[in-house]
């Protein structure tokens, strides 16, 4: 479960550092987070690089193998939107994803490869599409 949440945080929220992952609402313990990051790097889902501005920090990014998880996360979000009235995904976003899923997957993939995310930042997917997100 934790590994999927780390991948989700990269794709949906643009998190990249140990500290950012640690701040997630789910409250992962530091030792579990460290272990999962090592596993994700070892299995080729993430790559670890020095932080561009602070060489004492490391940033994590999805590899091609990791980017291939985007469709799975979109399907989980779609399922959640259908079955959980408390879901955080805007309905207009879900509708746009379902309208042309392959196009949206490509757009998300390109955005994440550039260091962006679906929901956070001025260059996020929802910002470029004009979708409101809380």
What spans do the regions from the language model cover?
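A general secondary-structure boundary signal
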Residues: 1-9, 41, 58-60, 73
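Residues within the helices of the helix-turn-helix
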Residues: 19, 38, 58
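Canonical helix-turn-helix DNA-binding module
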Residues: 24-51, 55
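C-terminal regulatory/oligomerization modules of transcriptional regulators
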Residues: 71-134
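Active-site micro-motifs of SAM-dependent methyltransferase domains
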Residues: 12, 39, 68
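N-terminal helix-turn-helix DNA-binding core of bacterial DNA-binding proteins
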Residues: 1-29
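Residues at helix-coil transition
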Residues: 12, 42, 78-81
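Basic, amphipathic "hinge/linker" alpha-helix immediately C-terminal to the N-terminal HTH DNA-binding motif
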Residues: 52-75
């Amino acid at each position: 479960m934790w590994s999927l949440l780390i991948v989700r945080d990269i794709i949906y929220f643009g998190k990249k550092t140990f500290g950012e992952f640690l701040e997630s609402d789910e409250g992962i313990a530091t030792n579990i987070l460290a272990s999962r990051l090592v596993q994700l790097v070892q299995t080729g889902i993430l790559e670890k690089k020095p932080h561009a501005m602070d060489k004492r920090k490391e940033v994590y990014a999805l590899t091609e193998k990791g980017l291939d998880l985007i469709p799975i996360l979109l399907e989980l979000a779609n399922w959640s939107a259908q079955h959980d009235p408390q879901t955080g995904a805007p309905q207009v976003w879900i509708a746009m994803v379902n309208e042309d899923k392959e196009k949206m997957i490509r757009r998300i993939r390109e955005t994440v490869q550039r260091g962006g995310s679906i929901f956070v930042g001025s260059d996020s997917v929802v910002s470029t599409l004009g979708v409101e997100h809380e």
